[in-house]
Amino acid sequence: MSANGKISVPEAVVNWLFKVIQPIYNDGRTTFHDSLALLDNFHSLRPRTRVFTHSDGTPQLLLSIYGTISTGEDGSSPHSIPVIMWVPSMYPVKPPFISINLENFDMNTISSSLPIQEYIDSNGWIALPILHCWDPAAMNLIMVVQELMSLLHEPPQDQAPSLPPKPNTQLQQEQNTPPLPPKPKSPHLKPPLPPPPPPQPASNALDLMDMDNTDISPTNHHEMLQNLQTVVNELYREDVDYVADKILTRQTVMQESIARFHEIIAIDKNHLRAVEQAIEQTMHSLNAQIDVLTANRAKVQQFSSTSHVDDEDVNSIAVAKTDGLNQLYNLVAQDYALTDTIECLSRMLHRGTIPLDTFVKQGRELARQQFLVRWHIQRITSPLS
């Protein structure tokens, strides 16, 4: 990181790194952060994507960080080694794989007494101690490189490391995470070449940093960059269109929901307004009736205070002048009562409340009583007429 707090990795590399990490790794955020921090601290390292073949033969596209690790700041230390660090898809749960970059490894230019020879197996894999005691919560890619650099500082061993010869093609490195051909008995004897590997389809992922100027011409390099930029632009446009469609869909749904909510509120307001009006009308009617009752009560009280009903004989008011008229009054009232009773029985019969035999029996009895009552009424009224 520079003095002004910015990373020294180019912005194009940062964008490419973020783009290729997200679909491959389970914890893309941690992988991107640790990889970017490693590239920012060690400028001799470069990122790329390659097909990694596991021990069971399963191929997988992974991020690999390659370059030269040395004890000197300028990379000119005699104890320097080209390495490739493969970041597994389960990182940081699983530690990275680190091996010697056999493409750039030259036994004639590297010291014969490599300090880390005891950690290198016959296939070129480097078994660092940190990888055996890996702690996902406390360790990262920078610590792996730092441990490798610290091991390069150690005094050299007596015997030179026995490394496999450089493979003939880059395809062999991408196809297998070795096995490689057996090491030669003498560094002066050329080992027999291994049989050519079966062809492996090229990976569809584009590498921004993995471009060798010795293998391709500047024109091809420029065309590849243009193709990469075209792919990135297409992906960007697809993402923008997808996000815009999602936002438009959600916006439409939210607008419809808001409109329905306003409609419900308007309906509830109208209902409440109607209820309030009904309550006001009912209150007005009740108040008017209360006023009428209050006025009538006042009239009754006034009449009671001014009248002399208590002094009058009640019998003189409610009783007729003769006994015959009093008897006639009672008989007429009894006749009306019998008529109402017969009509009530008839309605009960139609409703099925009483059975027919009960209706007939009770109706006959009531008719007999009514006949007698009317006969008495006729006897009383005959002399009067």
UniProtKB/Swiss-Prot annotation:
What is the stated purpose of this protein? Component of the ESCRT-I complex, a regulator of vesicular trafficking process. Binds to ubiquitinated cargo proteins and is required for the sorting of endocytic ubiquitinated cargos into multivesicular bodies (MVBs). Mediates the association to the ESCRT-0 complex. Required for vacuolar targeting of temperature-sensitive plasma membrane proteins STE2 and CAN1.
This protein's membrane topology, according to the annotation, is: Peripheral membrane protein
A GO CC annotation given for this chain:
cytosol
Question: Under what name is this protein listed?
Answer: Suppressor protein STP22 of temperature-sensitive alpha-factor receptor and arginine permease
Q: Which Pfam families match?
A: UEV (PF05743), Vps23_core (PF09454)
State which residue ranges cross the membrane. none
Q: How does it assemble?
A: Component of the ESCRT-I complex (endosomal sorting complex required for transport I) which consists of STP22, VPS28, SRN2 and MVB12 in a 1:1:1:1 stoichiometry. Interacts with HSE1 and VPS27. Interacts with MVB12 and SRN2.
- Domain SB: start-end pairs: 322-385
- Biological processes, Gene Ontology terms: ATP export; late endosome to vacuole transport; negative regulation of protein polyubiquitination; protein modification process; protein targeting to membrane; protein targeting to vacuole; reticulophagy; ubiquitin-dependent protein catabolic process via the multivesicular body sorting pathway
Every copy of the UEV domain together lies at 12-161
